[in-house]
Amino acid sequence: MRGRCWKFGDNISTDHIIAGRFLSTSEPGALAAHCMEDARPEFHKEVSPGDIVVAGDNFGCGSSREHAPIAMKGCKIGAVIASSFARIFFRNSINIGLPIIESVEAAREIEEGDDVEIDMNKSRILNHTSGKTYSFEPFPQEIRDIIAAGGLMKYVKKKMGK
């Protein structure tokens, strides 16, 4: 996957990603219309399919709402790169098939607007803007399969032949 980067700081909470006042639905398109609205009001209008969110420490902290990664996926975010993730956001992202990558160095050095490509199979991030390459700890194959399937439910249905 390849996209333009959107840079955020530390401690971006699930409330920053999708505010509680929009939780009356779990429909990805409806949530996408308000994704990151409190942090960047025009984000959902400016983001393009495949773009990548880059953030600092503790991305997705706060409440355990699954709506946050659903909103990001609804915006067609290609992946999130962060120094670290709140564990519940990390798990929810895998469950809905949103690729997430922990890389302190990449999160620190990638700039807003950089053109970045991620190869999940090779555990590599290539910043086409700076020419730098970063590696990250690969997921176990089953987790990669869940993400590739589009989330846990789709993965299970596929495994069951449904």
List each language-model region with its residue ranges.
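N-terminal, positively charged, Ser/Thr/Ala/Gly-biased leader segments
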Residues: M1-A19, K154-K162
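Pocket-edge structural micro-motifs
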Residues: G9, G56, T129
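Conserved phosphate/anionic-ligand binding catalytic regions in large, soluble enzymes, centered on
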Residues: I12, G60-E66, I147-K157
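Feature captures the catalytic cores and cofactor-binding loops of soluble hydro-lyases/lyases
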Residues: H16-K122
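Acidic, glycine-rich flexible loop/linker segments
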Residues: I96-K162
